């Protein structure tokens, strides 16, 4: 049986290309639900995508991977690297992320999280249905597009687990963890 995944898609030209790229590695492993939004989507940001991920988790009473077409709205050089990171992590280490959220406690797992402010770097994560219920209670429109990455899990009282440097107390340590992964993966110095 495949794990569940919700992929949020911003329907820009770049977003549709990224969707195709991501589906190539997601569909063999996951039962993917697509949620698409018309650009510019500068009012709801990730809200419709995360809402659907929560609903899928609750309906099926099982963990769900939430991802989005990183780089569709504000393309830059780092975003293809993040997508490569997601591809590696969420295909090669699927069971680690899904096993980390077993249980009744509201849990989310991601490659890199900050422990003091439980953010999920790049906002790709696996959540269980308990977390989904708590997130739905707090989910609303926010003017700050980064609320979904930087505040949502904290305000929802969701415990986070990061596979890399889960004790990162600040963004700099978490970023160094990501750079270390990139360096070892691609031999970049």
Q: Model-derived features: where do they sit?
A:
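ER/Golgi luminal nucleotide-sugar-dependent glycosyltransferases, focusing on the catalytic module
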Residues: 1-189
């Amino acid at each position: 049986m495949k794990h569940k995944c919700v992929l949020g898609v911003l329907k820009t030209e770049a977003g549709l290309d990224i969707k195709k790229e991501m589906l190539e590695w997601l569909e063999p492993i996951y039962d993917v639900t697509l949620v698409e939004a018309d650009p510019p989507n500068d009012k709801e940001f990730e809200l419709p995508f995360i809402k659907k991920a929560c609903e899928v988790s609750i309906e099926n009473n099982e963990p769900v991977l939430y991802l989005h077409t990183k780089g569709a709205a504000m393309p830059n050089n780092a975003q293809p690297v993040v997508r490569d990171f997601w591809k590696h992590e969420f295909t090669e280490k699927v069971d680690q992320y899904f096993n980390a959220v077993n249980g009744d406690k509201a849990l989310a797992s991601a490659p890199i999280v900050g422990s003091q402010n439980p953010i999920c770097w790049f906002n790709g994560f696996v959540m269980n249905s308990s977390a989904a219920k708590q997130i739905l209670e707090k989910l609303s429109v926010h003017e700050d597009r980064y609320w979904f990455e930087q505040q949502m899990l904290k305000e929802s009282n969701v415990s986070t687990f990061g596979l890399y440097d889960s004790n990162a107390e600040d963004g700099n340590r978490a970023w160094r963890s990501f750079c270390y992964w990139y360096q070892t993966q691609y031999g970049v110095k």
